[in-house]
UniProtKB/Swiss-Prot annotation:
The lineage of its organism: Eukaryota, Amoebozoa, Evosea, Eumycetozoa, Dictyostelia. Residues 1-20, 78-97 are annotated as: Disordered. GO terms for biological process: sorocarp development. InterPro entries: HssA/B-like_chaperone, HssA/B-related. It comes from the Eukaryota. This is HssA/B-like protein 48. Belongs to the hssA/B family.
Length: 97
């Protein structure tokens, strides 16, 4: 299992402020998923940046668990928060890869 960090600076139009989100996660290469999909995923416990739909955080595929597409999918993720293009509970692929 490989650890990685994703850093994103997001501007919130409603407050005109920037928030820096740092998320540490672990990606796996189980099944058809690659480690890169972990960084793109925003599944269970993922972070939805200021409600703007940026999916950062965990993209796990452990024992058929949570699999997500992160910012590429706009439905509800494993964590139950609205996706809006951020969190997604997809087929395990990352950004169409």
């Amino acid at each position: 299992m490989t650890l990685f960090a994703s850093i994103s600076s997001i501007s919130n139009p409603s407050t005109s402020s920037k928030s820096s989100i740092v998320s540490f996660g672990s990606g796996t290469s189980m099944g058809s998923n690659s480690i890169a999909c972990g960084g793109c995923g925003g599944g269970s416990g993922g972070i939805l940046g200021s409600g703007l739909g940026f999916g950062l955080g965990l993209g796990l595929n452990l024992s058929g668990g949570f699999r997500s597409r992160g910012a590429c999918r706009g439905n509800n993720g494993g964590s139950g928060y609205p996706g809006n293009g951020g969190m997604g509970g997809g087929n395990g692929s990352c950004c169409g890869i």
